[in-house]
Amino acid sequence: SDRLVGSEMCIRDRYNLLSNDQNYHFSYEILKEVGLSSNKIFNAFKSFRGLEFRQQIIFSDKRKLIINDSKSTNYHSLIAALKKYKDIILICGGQIKSNNISILDDSLGNIKKVIIIGEESNTFHKYFQSKVTTVYVQSLDKAVVEMSKFMKTNTDFNTFLFSPGAASFDQYNNFEERGRHFNKLISKLSK
């Protein structure tokens, strides 16, 4: 039987592949069942670029990886991102959907710094302040400025992860608008 080998596929790079491995295997089995050839399936997988704002890689080089996970609107999606990356500078915050922030406890090992934005920043600040370096900046614009400062003063590899873990309605109409704003701010950094 055909085997799906992760190294044969790529939606953008290996980071996204890791989070989608189960989805690929499931999709592969369904598509084989309806009669598509392995070759057609693999070609489709290779050309698939993933969905916007779902751990979307915005930029990557030897020193940094910038990820837009604006779809992260609750703690569970934030946990998924935190467990996946290392050397994280996290931008989080917004309107919290749950008071049970302690469910993040087992997911903090890879965080170097937290930049907090949004309406309910006190909850995030109280939670993170004794665990990791935190800074509160209110807006996404200011968070990206803070991120840029960190980039300029730090030569180690870092993952800059925008994974709010909260809803966007305090400052945006939806997570898509918030995600587009983040991408726009990042594109200005390179100019």
State what each model feature region is.
Residues 73, 94-97, 120, 161, ...:
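Short glycine-rich anion-binding loops that position phosphate/pyrophosphate groups of nucleotides
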Residues 90, 114, 162, 178:
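Hydrophobic, well-ordered secondary-structure elements that form the walls
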Residues 1-11:
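Single conserved hydrophobic/aromatic residue that forms the stacking wall/gate
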Residues 16-111:
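Nucleotide phosphate-binding/pyrophosphate-handling subdomain across enzymes
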Residues 101-159:
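C-terminal helical cap/extension that packs against the catalytic core
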Residues 164-191:
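Glycine/aspartate-rich loop-and-adjacent alpha/beta segment that forms the canonical ThDP
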